[in-house]
Amino acid sequence: MSVILVSAGYDHTIRFWEALTGVCSRTIQHSDSQVNRLEITNDKKLLATAGHQNVRLYDIRTTNPNPVASFEGHRGNVTSVSFQQDNRWMVTSSEDGTIKVWDVRSPSIPRNYKHNAPVNEVVIHPNQGELISCDRDGNIRIWDLGENQCTHQLTPEDDTSLQSLSMASDGSMLAAANTKGNCYVWEMPNHTDASHLKPVTKFRAHSTYITRILLSSDVKHLATCSADHTARVWSIDDDFKLETTLDGHQRWVWDCAFSADSAYLVTASSDHYVRLWDLSTREIVRQYGGHHKGAVCVALNDV
């Protein structure tokens, strides 16, 4: 499998797609809840699904419909999942107000970190020693895994839920987005840790709710998804100027993923469709249809 493209959502199914043809090649039933987020390990062996109160791992290389591991312990929807570099541990966030760090090989008692509000996303710093999370009260927290505590907190906008965070692959930048349509960007001048966040810009990306913010792997583009039925791509090198508005979904756009070369974007929407866009032409290259309810998460690995 050179290209792995997966989507999931409210119809309790996980769907694998042939990216070029648009054919659904495999469907996994996720019967007990919707799927909120998807994450593929960088070795392309495992798919993580974040559902209601649990995270499950599926073997990508077989047709086994059953999870190879299940991680129970959250008391609410799991809102994000992220793998450490060599996939030995993973971190999850939840509406129950906690972040949990799990040993992938033994789904036993995780390490816990607590927010005072539902946690919408957690990401791992490239140094693998810090976590950065955001919550519904509008707080960003930085957690030092060595010190086992929160070392920094900032609140860009009081009482405005921060829905999504994205960390640059080289540790140089952090981006966050909220329910008012605002994006915040910070530089991390020393790249090696998150101790010094230098504000770069704040801009209005959408007139309403932003559901996802994502930095491309080459740190040249920033994508935002919104309740306004669009996804937008912004140029980092050109002072976050709007590059492209992807217009075509009929309902909320919930999630997106860049291709490895940052030339394409995949989006997932409440209109049941997943779409592959050519960012240079704004055209829909492929539409993936098969979900019976909203598609709210997507994962792509084409490295």
UniProtKB/Swiss-Prot annotation:
Its main location: membrane. WD repeats lie at residues 1-27, 30-68, 73-112, 114-153, 157-196, 205-244, 248-287. Essential component of both TORC1 and TORC2. TORC1 regulates multiple cellular processes to control cell growth in response to environmental signals. Nutrient limitation and environmental stress signals cause inactivation of TORC1. Active TORC1 positively controls ribosome biogenesis via control of rRNA, ribosomal protein and tRNA gene expression, and rRNA processing. Pfam families: WD40. Present with 589 molecules/cell in log phase SD medium. This is Target of rapamycin complex subunit LST8. The target of rapamycin complex 1 (TORC1) is composed of at least KOG1, LST8, TCO89 and either TOR1 (TORC1-A) or TOR2 (TORC1-B). TORC1 binds to and is inhibited by FKBP-rapamycin. Interacts with PIB2; following activation of PIB2 by glutamine or cysteine and as part of the TORC1 complex. The target of rapamycin complex 2 (TORC2) is composed of at least AVO1, AVO2, BIT61, LST8, TOR2 and TSC11. TORC2 forms a homodimer. Contrary to TORC1, TORC2 does not bind to and is not sensitive to FKBP-rapamycin. LST8 binds to the C-terminal kinase domain in TOR2. The keyword Nucleus does not apply.
